[in-house]
């Protein structure tokens, strides 16, 4: 389903693609308070160790850290509160069916601003074993070596 992202990418979960095989991606909206969206627009968000879970037919994002807004007085938000994700019912049912299989989980890949709204790209992920991670690194290094050799050859 890979949607293209428009606008400013605010936060990326770089460890997600290292630790998981991403099977399918979904674009979801996030229910936020006023100070949260202001902090996100300022780029003060971290997706490290965050995950999504389906609870009572609704998707929630856990452990996503949005720093408190500097000018937000007593109405400021809690930095790591669970946040509701806005998905179509069909997408939620797909995620429920897939996550009930052993080894599948839902991880946020990136958060970006699209048409003034904060969106999160979540991925249906299957955990990698250590040997898979090493194999991925080997492949990446080999590709880098080939590109370096081609570049050197072109220079003459």
UniProtKB/Swiss-Prot annotation:
InterPro entries: SmpB (IPR023620), SsrA-bd_prot (IPR000037), SsrA-bd_prot_CS (IPR020081). Coiled coil: none annotated. It is found in: Cytoplasm. It comes from the Bacteria. GO terms for cellular component: cytosol. GO terms for biological process: trans-translation. Its main location: cytoplasm. GO terms for molecular function: RNA binding. Keywords: Cytoplasm, RNA-binding. Belongs to the SmpB family. PANTHER family: SSRA-BINDING PROTEIN, TMRNA-BINDING COMPONENT OF TRANS-TRANSLATION TAGGING COMPLEX. Required for rescue of stalled ribosomes mediated by trans-translation. Binds to transfer-messenger RNA (tmRNA), required for stable association of tmRNA with ribosomes. tmRNA and SmpB together mimic tRNA shape, replacing the anticodon stem-loop with SmpB. tmRNA is encoded by the ssrA gene; the 2 termini fold to resemble tRNA(Ala) and it encodes a 'tag peptide', a short internal open reading frame. During trans-translation Ala-aminoacylated tmRNA acts like a tRNA, entering the A-site of stalled ribosomes, displacing the stalled mRNA. This is SsrA-binding protein. It comes from Shouchella clausii (strain KSM-K16) (Alkalihalobacillus clausii).
